Amino acid sequence: MERSLRVAVAMSGGVDSLRAAILLKEQGNDVFGVHMRHVPPSRTGRWCAGAMIREKEAFLCELGLRFGFPIAVVDLRDAFESHVIEPFMEAYLLGQTPNPCIFCNPAVKFGFLMEKARALGAERFATGHYARVSPPGPTSRRFRLLRGSDLSKDQSYFLYGLSQDQLASTLFPLGSTRKRDVSAWAGQLGIASLFPGESQEICFVPAGKYHEFLTERLDTLHAPAEGPILDLEGRELGRHKGIFAYTIGQRRGLGIASSAPLYVVGLEPAANAVRVGRVGDLDRDRLEVGRVNWVSIPAPNVPVRCRVRIRNQHAPAAAVVTPVGERSASVRFEAPQRAVTPGQSAVFYDGDVVLGGGTISK
């Protein structure tokens, strides 16, 4: 029988992290929760009322009392500001569409929060992610990151930036669990109503306030606002309200008339221009990535045949990834892919194994 471990569980306030904590406790582990206070001090008054923050933290503490484990609140607002929100805004200035979870996981959640958990005596750090970790074995000397068994909920895409040290300390109790089973568990306990439906919003931006948040933040960075909407021949078709309000593949909200549907095919920060074209102009068979992290294998020095996802809901597509220096790579797909978006991540897979990934630069 394996010995009991002292395990810290990152508690977001959702049902998945609670279920992860309960599973670990049922296995005989000494479990405690850690909740990350992350709304930056400069934003608390306007974007997330202090009362709302206190209400969420009180809710988490009540959950801990009900299910028999303590929960510590860790103030990481400054770290979240510098490691997540600032690079998030900088990416928009570059005409990119960033994913803040990609910044947060390696630096803050599995970085600062994991270190705080260790300082509180944790031997392992767990989250409610639907992903798996495979320990070193006969075929690999490294910890490997794997897709979650429930592929409809798999969250491995957001975790490719983790290090070997982080993987070695991490547990994913829901890795082999189906989301519907977690929902059924909550229903059986009569607590499903405590957890609202999953939000697709960014965690530090209130629902419906995305454009307002970006506008205020970018105003402080003196980002240019209005500019031209151009077709592929350079003709001006209209005016945009700031390139940060657009993303590759967008069709709605362009405010221009055309005999055929037009889509955003490029964002050009140097010219402060939005470029539009027909749907076929969105198809590309190659891209380049930077800030590459090879999570499950040593960094290769030869091309790698694998499958690549260019967004979380994208079906992995056959491609060849060619390393370029230490932290960059080029990707060539067997078939063109639609709406390759700079700022999003390209994540490399060999079956269920996450080989690595990086940020799409162009």
UniProtKB/Swiss-Prot annotation:
GO cellular component, one term: cytoplasm
EC number: 2.8.1.13
UniProt keyword Transferase, yes or no: yes
UniProt keyword annotations, A-Z: ATP-binding, Cytoplasm, Disulfide bond, Nucleotide-binding, RNA-binding, Transferase, tRNA processing, tRNA-binding
Stretch forming the signal peptide: none
Annotated segments matching region Interaction with tRNA: 153-155
Task performed by this protein: Catalyzes the 2-thiolation of uridine at the wobble position (U34) of tRNA, leading to the formation of s(2)U34.
Protein name (database record): tRNA-specific 2-thiouridylase MnmA
Gene source species: Syntrophobacter fumaroxidans (strain DSM 10017 / MPOB)
High-level lineage: Bacteria, Pseudomonadati, Thermodesulfobacteriota, Syntrophobacteria, Syntrophobacterales
Gene encoding the protein: mnmA
